Amino acid sequence: MAFQEKQVPPGASGAQKLMAWVDSRLPVTEAFKRHMSEYYAPKNLNFFYIFGALAIVVLAIQIITGIFLVMNYKPDAAKAFESVEYIMREVPFGWLIRYMHSTGASMFFVVVYMHMFRGLIYGSYRKPRELIWIFGCAIFLCLMGEAFFGYLLPWGQMSYWGAQVIVNLFSAIPFIGPDLSLWLRGDYVVGDATLNRFFAFHVIAIPLVLIGLVAAHILALHEVGSNNPDGVEIKNNLDAQGHPVDGIPFHPYYSVHDVMYLGGFLIIFASIVFFAPEMGGYFLEANNFIPANPFQTPSHIAPVWYFTPFYSMLRATTTNFLLPLWIFLAVILGMFAIKAKDIKIKGACVAIALALAGGFYLLDAKFWGVVIMGGSVVIMFFLPWLDHSPVKSIRYRPAFHKYIYGVFVVTFVILGYLGIQPPSPMFEKISQICTIYYLGFFLAMPFWSTLGTFKPVPSRVTFEAH
């Protein structure tokens, strides 16, 4: 097709002429209409729907502050800690940039956890939004990697020994584990080579992947449309112009709405940065203000709070826990075998149960702890196919479903708390019970999600004007 210059009306302003010139070469106005002013979102979105926008803002904060930190940071084991102190003491407003970055890391996980919780209770992972959910889980996985690689960079005591513990976990993988952990470290111990590797991953590799996944997440969302608290597809009810009857343009209605909540969020964010940047040791640990010492292990090594639920599951997987864990998994597989009609599926369930029995006998608890910790994240990718409920939203599910979700949230919080605490026999038992419930919530979902009496779902969204 031949190139055509976009025409402007006579007497158009200079700005209109410039925009027409740009649009002829890059469809900026068309993209704005498609993704903002003519993107129709359900009119009954509530408080839980602000966290996606907040996550984008925090991502921008992290990228901008990270750029300024890298200008003065030295990825050298002999200079890393001193360079952070130099940023804090000598660089103009360096303390502010560093505290914004460290606070942003924790707040990123706060808004992402809330964003995922909203998707969980309102069924935002159900058809046709499976790909949106998968991209979201991939973002979460990348975010965990980004946080882990960045955690080593201050080269403090907790950074050093935390990295040592986590990298050593890879050695538990049969056959390839020792070589894999050696490749990650770049040496036989965490040192200068490790720091340079982690710096490259944290500053270049993962941010590029993260930005790409965020773009894919948003594009997939705008292709199928946003979910809503009722789980009703607004595209099923269109007006004469082909617009959803229960939808409103994202801009200006939700963009202005989100700006109001963004103001409140930034007040909280600034309050933490200026008055409690360490948050009692949860955002910045006291041991990380001590230079890394390979010859002195801290009395208690614990990850940052946003990793602790998964770390708690890792620590709960002891030798004594393997038998109860196998019994639990065998029961789940037995339920799948009973439900399945195909004899091949029944046989596969029995074979998996026997293979797990052999694996629990031959492989040590450390390996299975790594499997449980990794599996607890990976299992979220399969949520769209685990939930067999006839309705999406928790609003129309049986009452006991709400209790199942509520106990799941409490279990996750308990695991997070126990992951910070020093190990003890009592905490170990509680962690094991919570681990079983966490896994059971997902693995048994095909069964419990279909039980009970479901409320009728309305044909249109429920909405009350303010």
Where are these regions (language model features)?
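Membrane-embedded and interfacial regions of multi-pass energy-transducing membrane proteins
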Residues: A2-M107, V111-H466
